[in-house]
Amino acid sequence: MAPSAKRSGPRKQKRNVPSGVAHIQSTFNNTIVSITDPNGEVIAWASAGSSGFKGAKKGTPFAAQTAADNAARRAIDQGMRQIEVMVSGPGSGRETAIRALQAAGLEITLIRDVTPIPHNGCRPPKRRRV
């Protein structure tokens, strides 16, 4: 049996980042929360799927709240205090994720909706008939 290999690469260091940007991407199927430093380097992230939800439950507001709480806790461990929030997408977890970030102890300085809106770009998919 081969001996267990020791990890010798550079470990991820804890950085002290007092302020940053929280990007919330909320779709109908999932919610992804990425917290970055002001330059855009990701410090912490979480999604409804990584928080333990599967299938249709990933699209719920409660799953978005849990994902935002997990990401906020990891960012606070790195020393984050203030964040700007960029919200993108039409999902149901948008407001809940913002409230969860605030409840976790992060001070929100700005909320901006950055959902991409086409100026009559590509043809959208046909309407669903259910």
Curated annotation (Swiss-Prot):
Q: Name one GO biological process term.
A: translation
Q: A Pfam family name for this chain?
A: Ribosomal_S11
The protein's matches in InterPro entries, at most eight in alphabetical order, are given as: Ribosomal_uS11, Ribosomal_uS11_bac-type, Ribosomal_uS11_CS, Ribosomal_uS11_sf
- Keyword flag Iron: no
The terms describing its cellular component in GO are: ribonucleoprotein complex; ribosome
Superkingdom assignment: Bacteria
Q: Which GO terms describe its molecular function?
A: rRNA binding; structural constituent of ribosome
* Assembly with partners or alone: Part of the 30S ribosomal subunit. Interacts with proteins S7 and S18. Binds to IF-3.
Classification via NCBIfam families:
PRK05309.1 (NF003698), uS11_bact (TIGR03632)
Q: Describe the function of this protein.
A: Located on the platform of the 30S subunit, it bridges several disparate RNA helices of the 16S rRNA. Forms part of the Shine-Dalgarno cleft in the 70S ribosome.
Its recorded name reads Small ribosomal subunit protein uS11
Gene encoding the protein: rpsK
